[in-house]
Amino acid sequence: LSLVGSEMCIRDSTVVGAEALIRWRKEDGSLWSPGKFIPLFEKNGMISTLDEYIFREVCRQQEVWEKEGKKMFPVSVNISRASLYFGDIVDKYKGILEQYTLDSRYIELEITESATINNSEIASLIEKFHEAGFHVLLDDFGNGYSSLASLNVMHFDTLKLDKSLIDYIGDKNGETLLYYITRLAQTLGLTITAEGVETKEQVEFIHKLQCTDIQGFYFSKPLPLLEFIEFISHQKEDSQQESLVM
């Protein structure tokens, strides 16, 4: 298994965060996407072990960066639906964080919109994560069937707009929908991240909406860890030469 640095969230031409992804490296060096191997972990009951592995690896890498004096920013980790049902997940993740003596602001937790459907316990779990110092992100918003009312019940810190919503840009009705979704989120005090941004047109429209962060192939594809570190080291220099954000 190979931990991969994800697409970057970028605000004002600076990297302000990242998302940790996992890829399975085969013997020939090629990679399997999560869609091919995650179902296997879910089927054999090992998905929570995988989630914990990713969380621990991100903590370890963040500790390395901190000791090296590098600029720190939050890295988000996905939590599967199955892991949410483990009663000790908050204590377990808090304990791992303490092992690496990290500030909780450098590790964020992503929960997919689909995981919140028909799950009355999620709201309580989010509050427990907050008490432990974690920021909790609602991932893939707009891709599932959860009610807008859930945003009032479940106190997420960040709303990540699914790529399917971003692809509406260029369509009048779609842009109107995006406008009111972002206004609602901002009124509720949520930070907003637009996912799957691929074109200059999308970047320009999203900035008109005063969206906080942008994530997508327009800035960078998901990068292996070493390439991500190199990208970060050159990012400041590159941003001085050419602004990535209009």
What are these regions (language model features)?
Residues L1-G5, C9-I10, I214:
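Single conserved hydrophobic/aromatic residue that forms the stacking wall/gate
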Residues S6-I38, V58:
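A short, well-structured catalytic beta-strand-centered motif of the EAL phosphodiesterase domain
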Residues T14-E19, M46-I122, G196:
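Catalytic core of bacterial c-di-GMP phosphodiesterases, primarily the EAL and HD-GYP domains
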Residues A20, K36, L40-F41, I54-Q62, ...:
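Structural preference for long, well-ordered alpha-helical segments in enzyme cores
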Residues E27, V64-K71, Q99-D103, E131, ...:
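Nucleotide second-messenger and two-component phosphorelay signaling modules
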Residues P34, D51, I89, Y93, ...:
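The cytosolic transmitter module of two-component sensor histidine kinases
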Residues K94-I169, L184, L188-P222:
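The catalytic core of metal-dependent phosphodiesterases that act on cyclic dinucleotides
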Residues H207, L223-M246:
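C-terminal helical cap(s) of enzyme catalytic domains, especially alpha/beta-barrels
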